[in-house]
Amino acid sequence: MNRPSLAGAVHLHGFSRSFHGKQVLDDLGLDIAPGQFVALLGESGSGKTTLLRALAGLDVEARSSGTAVAHGNVSVLFQDSRLLPWLTVLDNLTLGLDAQAVRPAAAQLLREVGLADKAAAWPASLSGGQKQRAALARSLLREPHVLLADEPFGALDALTRLRMQGLLRRMVERVRPTVILVTHDVDESLLLADRILVLRDGKIAEDHALDLAHPRRPDHPAFMQLRATLLRSLGVEAEFV
């Protein structure tokens, strides 16, 4: 009997991580199904980015115990686009791959993110939003089973941020990777995710499933109710909810 593929599944069991004696993640247990879009919320220092970096195989010098596995190909999308300034946009996308073989797919992704005319451009000539679109295309060119996104739109202005959120959602619906998004923006998590986790003191304090069709409206009663719940759990006073 053929066993189902684990590609895209994420599994943590009894996972802890500390830096210089400070416990950041504490005995985490978590299962994420392939294709699920999960948002991580929490105050600064709650362990969101540490969890993401553990799944990406980073910070190996940290003291860790337990299991943290992201099955299949993993791509990471950072807040900083991390485009190399001495390479063109297209060459940044294909870096580390068989450039000749993936060039058609790279060109198609640039068209999909609205950068078809920027393939030969230098990163310094791009706006912040354009750089993040290029970074998203670069991540998806790797055909990831798991996409780890660490506040990828945090440095963008409000309008560009909304456009990028819509672009990410459309691209994810087409490619269907598992997505784990670290964000401080409650509305962003509600607009994009299928499941929202709240981290507190290195533990998963809350786990919310969202059963709202896309595109989502912030004035939908269920959206507003969960928004209020999440804001309160993050310490926002009732008068601001």
From Swiss-Prot:
Function, in words: Part of the ABC transporter complex SsuABC involved in aliphatic sulfonates import. Responsible for energy coupling to the transport system.
SMART domains hit by this protein: AAA
Binding site residues for ATP: 42-49
Span of domain ABC transporter: 10-226
Pfam families: ABC_tran
EC number: 7.6.2.14
Organism ancestry: Bacteria, Pseudomonadati, Pseudomonadota, Betaproteobacteria, Burkholderiales
Protein's gene: ssuB
Membrane topology (UniProt): Peripheral membrane protein
UniProtKB keywords: ATP-binding, Cell inner membrane, Cell membrane, Membrane, Nucleotide-binding, Translocase, Transport
Keyword ATP-binding set for record: yes
Catalytic activity: ATP + H2O + aliphatic sulfonate-[sulfonate-binding protein]Side 1 = ADP + phosphate + aliphatic sulfonateSide 2 + [sulfonate-binding protein]Side 1
Broad enzyme group: translocase
Subunit note: The complex is composed of two ATP-binding proteins (SsuB), two transmembrane proteins (SsuC) and a solute-binding protein (SsuA).
Gene3D superfamilies: P-loop containing nucleotide triphosphate hydrolases
Localisation: Cell inner membrane
Keyword Nucleus found: no
GO MF entries: ATP binding; ATP hydrolysis activity
Family designation: Belongs to the ABC transporter superfamily. Aliphatic sulfonates importer (TC 3.A.1.17.2) family.
Chief subcellular location: membrane
UniProt-recorded name of the protein: Aliphatic sulfonates import ATP-binding protein SsuB
Gene Ontology CC terms: plasma membrane
Source species of the chain: Delftia acidovorans
Record InterPro entries: AAA+_ATPase (IPR003593), ABC_transporter-like_ATP-bd (IPR003439), ABC_transporter-like_CS (IPR017871), ABC_transporter_ATP-bind (IPR050166), P-loop_NTPase (IPR027417)
